[in-house]
Regions:
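Alpha-helical segments
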Residues: 1-242
């Protein structure tokens, strides 16, 4: 099953708007209303005031967007990989859905799997996922593991526990909303791998094009202050980017 970029965009929007009751909102400007950012680097940037409780959420409190993004420097920069891989770009459109204190992990995890397998036709057995393994600052995301494993049915050998570098998102600037995340990967097959040895080619091991990250589910529930301390946000939110 093959789709054009426009068809994938339309399917993503229609799934969340028509099937999951989201408000479809336009992309915000590439120039963000945020003094800590040079350019809009993620779909959640326009919603930071809502996540922080400084602005009201839309009605209903869930949204879907296709956000124009640029990454040319800073923490989220992909510029060093542009030209080295087939998947990194400085400018791109990020497909995203957002919950402002509405739904959380037990909803978005099964929805994401349904969208990529039933709506977009990816083979379920080729979907791999990662979760935050925890560290001295924040605990492991056992809730996400249980939902993927028990509710969705992803076997343990296709669920990878990853470090903060890979599976804890944000904030987009030095301070702001953040939280653990769970990423979906698609196995394109051994023809795209860099080695037949699983110890050399795999998620978290190499940067080849076999295992392609297709979606990042961020569980936006914390605020990081200027001293590096974390505190709970007033509501548990969802911020995804594909």
């Amino acid at each position: 099953m093959t789709f054009s970029g426009a068809e994938i965009r339309d399917k993503f929007i229609s799934y969340f708007r028509d099937k999951r009751g989201h408000l479809a909102l336009p992309s915000s400007s590439l120039i963000p209303d945020n003094p800590t950012l040079l350019l809009t680097s993620a779909g959640m940037v326009q919603f930071v005031p809502i996540f922080l409780g400084q602005a009201p959420a839309p009605n209903p409190p869930r949204a879907v967007t296709v956000q124009k993004c640029a990454r040319a420097g800073g923490k989220d920069s992909d510029i060093e990989n542009v030209g080295r891989t087939a998947r990194h770009h400085t400018f791109f459109e990020m497909l995203g859905n957002f919950s402002f204190g509405d739904y959380f992990k037990k909803e978005i995890i099964p929805w994401s799997f349904e969208l990529v397998t039933k709506e977009l036709g990816l083979e379920p057995e080729k979907i791999y996922v990662t979760i935050f393994k925890g560290d001295e600052q924040n605990p492991a995301d056992e809730e996400a593991y249980t939902i993927w494993n028990k509710d969705v049915g992803i076997p343990a050998e296709r669920i990878f526990r990853m470090s903060r570098k890979d599976n804890f998102w944000g904030p987009p600037g030095p301070t702001g909303p953040c939280g653990p995340c769970s990423e979906l990967y698609y196995d394109r097959g051994p023809d795209y791998g860099c080695s037949d040895d699983p110890a050399k080619c795999g998620i978290g091991i190499c940067e080849c094009d076999r295992y392609l990250e297709i979606w990042n589910l961020v569980f936006m529930e914390l605020f990081k202050d200027e001293n590096g301390n974390f505190s709970p946000l007033a509501a548990k939110n969802v911020d995804t980017g594909s």
